[in-house]
Each structure stands twice: as C-alpha cells, then as structure tokens.
C-alpha cells in the first residue's frame, strides 16, 4: 500500500531519537546544530550557531562539510515542524551517523518559546 508523506514521517519517528527543546538547549553546547530547511527559511531566522544543508541535498553534501567528517559526532537536526528533520535523521543513521537526534517541534516550537534566533548566514555549500 502506498504511503503518504505523513506516513513516512511517522515511520521515521519510530527509528530515531526525538528530543524536546530543553534537551536540545542542553545538548547545543557540544553538538552540531543542523538546519535542513530551505535557504530562504534559514535566512529568515534560525537557531544560533546552526548550519544549513537543505533536506533535498543533505545526503549528497553532508560528507563534504568539515564538521561532519566524523560519523560519531553529536548532531541535532531541525526543520520547521520536525517532519523533514525526522526523515533526515533516519537517513543519516542509515549512512552511519550514530549521534543523530531530531528536535521535536522544530524551529516553530523554538521561536514560539521565544528562544534566541539568529539571522546571520551560515549556509554550507550555497
């Protein structure tokens, strides 16, 4: 039976670790923060220190990023609401990245909680 995008996200969530905002804030001090939204979304505002590799290019570009050459690096992934992040986390796990976690609720939850937002560009491979 064919699956919808929501079905794919729900299935991905059964195989990944999702963390809440408090856990994300605690982990941000030692983990790489990866924004998988589109560049225009990233430019409008992103979590402090995040790098941007859009979801559609992630599997092709992640190995080129110097901070992501070690597959045991802690990586926190987010998107707008956490659907794309869940799919990205699953694929990175399949590629051998072992410290991958998705931030539940994504950037929308972050900004609604009035947490800090940056607008400085840190896109990779743009």
Predicted regions and their residues:
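Short, surface-exposed ligand- or partner-binding patches at beta-edge/loop junctions that are enriched
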Residues: 78
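Rhodanese-like catalytic fold shared by cysteine-dependent sulfurtransferases
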Residues: 1-32, 39-74, 83-126
């Amino acid at each position: 039976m064919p699956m919808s995008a929501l079905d794919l996200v729900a299935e991905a969530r059964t195989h990944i670790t999702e963390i809440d905002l408090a856990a994300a804030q605690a982990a941000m001090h030692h983990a790489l923060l990866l924004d998988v939204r589109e560049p225009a979304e990233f430019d409008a505002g992103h979590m402090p220190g995040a790098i941007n590799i859009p979801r559609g290019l992630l599997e092709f570009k992640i190995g080129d990023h110097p901070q992501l050459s070690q597959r045991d690096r802690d990586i926190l992934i987010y998107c707008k609401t956490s659907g794309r992040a869940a799919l990205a986390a699953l694929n990175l796990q399949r590629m051998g990245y072992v410290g991958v976690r998705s931030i539940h609720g994504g950037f929308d939850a972050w900004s609604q909680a009035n947490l800090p937002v940056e607008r400085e560009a840190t896109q990779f491979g743009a």
